[in-house]
Amino acid sequence: MADVINVSVNLEAFSQAISAIQALRSSVSRVFDCLKDGMRNKETLEGREKAFIAHFQDNLHSVNRDLNELERLSNLVGKPSENHPLHNSGLLSLDPVQDKTPLYSQLLQAYKWSNKLQYHAGLASGLLNQQSLKRSANQMGVSAKRRPKAQPTTLVLPPQYVDDVISRIDRMFPEMSIHLSRPNGTSAMLLVTLGKVLKVIVVMRSLFIDRTIVKGYNENVYTEDGKLDIWSKSNYQVFQKVTDHATTALLHYQLPQMPDVVVRSFMTWLRSYIKLFQAPCQRCGKFLQDGLPPTWRDFRTLEAFHDTCRQ
């Protein structure tokens, strides 16, 4: 037990070393104070320079003297024992062949690693609890056997049913014309023309809207080979904004059990852009803000807002 307490440290030299550190810090502070004050209290420039140099040299000598004193005392302090036994595990340090069987040092390393692992695991657990992915509170009571996932029925609807839904939506809105085509097989592509305001390319998989691109009424929506251009953006910032809002609307209108209602709701929302350049903002009452009309349409009331006014 006495070996554990004896760490071979000269306490008197240790106390003197602390005082030497304080003296060194004071002398270093005086050096910076001298540099901060500069040349003062002399009438002539030459006298100020000589006084400044002499004062600066004295402060540097003080720093050098205090540093040498601290180095001398550090050699007198001594080094503590490198072995810190942990109860019965301290017996492992008595192994005479430390290089061949370094059990004690490995045990200390494993102990430090375990503490770090526990600390980081606690941090990760706190972050994961803040970003919980549970969709309902009833998942804790489900059985261990997971139910087989049902295949989505939205993607396997017959093309005739899709054509009938699009045809009925086309008849609902006289100011909107919808042209349906299938250039790549069974997946439908819609070209929606809303009055003389804009054109919308809608890429569908069965009755699931996959992508929308909004362009101006006079912009070209076809590629060189005559197919609908589903990749290039509009040349006008106002229609780029409407494209972003349409993508947000696709995420809002989600009802997998009734896909026809989703398409009809989206087309109703899209039809509200018939007065894109005529309706004022419902909050600020202005027609233009930063050179743009109100490009946002509320998903429930279909009222017009500027992008910054809807916040």
From Swiss-Prot:
The modification Phosphoserine is found at S132. Changing V242A: In NEDSCAC; uncertain significance. The modification N6-methyllysine is found at K134. The keyword Transcription regulation applies. One of its GO terms (biological process) is regulation of transcription by RNA polymerase II. Changing P293L: In NEDSCAC; uncertain significance. One of its GO terms (cellular component) is cytosol. It holds the Pfam family Med27. It is found in: Nucleus. Changing G291S: In NEDSCAC; uncertain significance. Its main location: nucleus. One of its GO terms (molecular function) is ubiquitin protein ligase activity. Keywords: Activator, Cataract, Intellectual disability, Methylation, Nucleus, Phosphoprotein, Transcription, Transcription regulation. It is linked to Neurodevelopmental disorder with spasticity, cataracts, and cerebellar hypoplasia: An autosomal recessive disorder characterized by global developmental delay, impaired intellectual development, and poor or absent speech. More severely affected individuals do not achieve independent ambulation, whereas others develop some speech and can walk, or show regression later in childhood. Additional features include axial hypotonia, peripheral spasticity, dystonia, cataracts, and seizures. Brain imaging usually shows cerebellar hypoplasia, thin corpus callosum, cerebral atrophy, and hypomyelination. Component of the Mediator complex, a coactivator involved in the regulated transcription of nearly all RNA polymerase II-dependent genes. Mediator functions as a bridge to convey information from gene-specific regulatory proteins to the basal RNA polymerase II transcription machinery. Mediator is recruited to promoters by direct interactions with regulatory proteins and serves as a scaffold for the assembly of a functional preinitiation complex with RNA polymerase II and the general transcription factors. Belongs to the Mediator complex subunit 27 family. Component of the Mediator complex, which is composed of MED1, MED4, MED6, MED7, MED8, MED9, MED10, MED11, MED12, MED13, MED13L, MED14, MED15, MED16, MED17, MED18, MED19, MED20, MED21, MED22, MED23, MED24, MED25, MED26, MED27, MED29, MED30, MED31, CCNC, CDK8 and CDC2L6/CDK11. The MED12, MED13, CCNC and CDK8 subunits form a distinct module termed the CDK8 module. Mediator containing the CDK8 module is less active than Mediator lacking this module in supporting transcriptional activation. This is Mediator of RNA polymerase II transcription subunit 27. It comes from Homo sapiens.
